[in-house]
């Protein structure tokens, strides 16, 4: 992995970012927003409302993007995260966080809220990445992110050709079987795979796993019967470790339609998880 840390996952980019104001007159102010393009969004904020920036940031720049949380399965999931981060007092998931403390800066308060959000349902089980766009402004969170949420540094790179993985690179992996084969069978239930999004396939070289989303989810959740969304598990074919988020993104990479950045995607099943 390069100095920028974890690469952006393949597929559409949905991020929720934290801006920090460098204007001496407004220094210390922050802004939370949603974006599909971090570089362009910062330019819009610094360009004012006429350039597409928010009214709260217009005329108060320059603004710097300090960090961005990305890896959301859909724009709706990211927008719900954005709303809760902006209004922690109104989210029942964050009732335990408490209001801003006396002497606590807006920046520190938003980092405290973020730390709790990454460990609160439903976000605690999403395959998110915490990226410090400005590594020099990095601070340790009051609660460390969950083990499956990696830290990354620097601006998000262009769409990555391969997903994040725990063990060695798969650059020399053999071509995967055609996921669109209408006669493909699930490796777990042996039934024909007819899912519109195609089967989940193991990315490890030589592994021929193909499985229904539900079948593999049930396999991964055997040790967590009370949960609905897996975090990770062992491939039932090659017995190597897999992150659930990587499997989903690999599947989406082959099925996702190209749309304009300004368009919002249809609701994902994780959007039904209440905030």
UniProtKB/Swiss-Prot annotation:
SUPFAM superfamilies for the chain: GIY-YIG endonuclease (SSF82771)
**What Pfam families does UniProt report for this protein, alphabetically?**
GIY-YIG, SLX1_C
Where does this protein have compositionally biased stretches of type Pro residues? 148-161
EC number(s) of the enzyme?
3.1.-.-
Q: What does the UniProt record say this protein does?
A: Catalytic subunit of the SLX1-SLX4 structure-specific endonuclease that resolves DNA secondary structures generated during DNA repair and recombination. Has endonuclease activity towards branched DNA substrates, introducing single-strand cuts in duplex DNA close to junctions with ss-DNA. Has a preference for 5'-flap structures, and promotes symmetrical cleavage of static and migrating Holliday junctions (HJs). Resolves HJs by generating two pairs of ligatable, nicked duplex products.
Zinc fingers (SLX1-type), renumbered ranges: 186-238
Task: Please name the source species.
Answer: Homo sapiens (Human)
Quote the protein name from its UniProt record.
Structure-specific endonuclease subunit SLX1
Q: Which GO terms describe its molecular function?
A: 5'-flap endonuclease activity; crossover junction DNA endonuclease activity; zinc ion binding
Underlying gene = SLX1A
Q: Which PROSITE patterns does the record associate with it?
A: GIY_YIG
Residue ranges constituting the GIY-YIG domain according to the UniProt record: 12-95
Q: What cofactor does this protein call for?
A: a divalent metal cation
Tell me its family: Belongs to the SLX1 family.
Single biological process term from Gene Ontology: negative regulation of telomere maintenance via telomere lengthening
């Amino acid at each position: 992995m390069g100095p920028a840390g974890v690469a952006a996952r393949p597929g559409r980019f949905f991020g929720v970012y934290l801006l920090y104001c460098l204007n001496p007159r407004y220094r210390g102010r922050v802004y939370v927003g949603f974006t599909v393009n971090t570089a362009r969004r910062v330019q819009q904020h610094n360009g004012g409302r006429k350039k597409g920036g928010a009214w709260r940031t217009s005329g108060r720049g320059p603004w710097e993007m300090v960090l961005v949380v990305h890896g959301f399965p859909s724009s709706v999931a990211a927008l719900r995260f954005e709303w809760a981060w902006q209004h922690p007092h109104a989210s029942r998931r964050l009732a335990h966080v408490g209001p801003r403390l006396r002497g606590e800066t807006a920046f520190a308060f938003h980092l405290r809220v973020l730390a709790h959000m990454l460990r609160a349902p439903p976000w605690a089980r999403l395959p998110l990445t915490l990226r410090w766009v400005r590594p020099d402004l990095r601070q340790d969170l009051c609660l460390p992110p969950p083990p499956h949420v990696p830290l990354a540094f620097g601006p998000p790179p262009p769409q990555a050709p391969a997903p994040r993985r725990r063990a060695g690179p798969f650059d020399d992996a053999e071509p995967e079987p055609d996921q669109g084969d209408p006669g493909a069978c699930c490796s777990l239930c042996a039934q024909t795979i007819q899912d519109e999004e195609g089967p989940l396939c193991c990315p490890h070289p030589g592994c021929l796993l193909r499985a229904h989303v539900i079948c593999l989810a049930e396999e991964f959740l055997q040790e967590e019967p009370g949960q609905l969304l897996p975090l990770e598990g062992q491939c039932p074919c090659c017995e190597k470790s897999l992150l659930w988020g990587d499997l989903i993104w690999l599947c989406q990479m082959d099925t996702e339609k190209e749309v304009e950045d300004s368009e919002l995607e249809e609701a994902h099943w994780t959007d039904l998880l209440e905030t």
